[in-house]
A protein has these predicted regions:
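Short, surface-exposed secondary-structure boundary micro-motifs
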Residues: 9, 30, 66-67
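Short, structured beta-strand/loop micro-motifs enriched in basic residues and often containing a Trp
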Residues: 39-47
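Short aromatic-glycine-enriched beta-strand elements
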Residues: 18-27
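C-terminal structural segments of small proteins and small subunits
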Residues: 69-106
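Structural detector for short beta-strands of small beta-barrel domains
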Residues: 1-13
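Mid-chain, well-packed structural core segment of small domains
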Residues: 47-83
Length: 107
């Protein structure tokens, strides 16, 4: 799993029938949830993920990939490689809050 930020939505006019009602989002992976890094930063790695939670552009999300992406009730029969499994409210590391739901950061 990794933390990423939704940077956009992907619209397709045709897709695999099993995915007909699926919302797709563009997610950029983040790094920096370590002792030396005071904030989450974009890595430049971008991927497309199925999102059944309704994440919006700018929100931080928890993403899983590979065979684990096909273990949710919704994606069990879909040909997917990445799925949003959570919308991040707060990231805490030891005594620091890296990200709060209101978008503010503290160190």
């Amino acid at each position: 799993m990794f933390i990423g930020r939704v940077t956009g939505h992907l619209v397709t006019t045709q897709k695999e029938p099993a995915m007909a009602d699926s919302k797709l989002v563009v997610v950029e992976a983040c790094s920096g949830a370590g002792p030396a890094e005071p904030a989450l930063k974009a890595t430049g790695k971008v991927l497309v993920a199925v999102d059944s939670l309704g994440a919006g552009v700018g929100e931080f999300v928890l993403v899983t990939q590979g065979s684990s992406a096909r273990l949710t009730e919704r994606t069990r029969t879909m040909p997917v490689d990445a799925v949003v499994i959570g919308i991040v409210d707060t990231v805490r590391l030891q005594d620091r809050v890296l990200r709060r739901a209101d978008g503010t950061l503290t160190g």
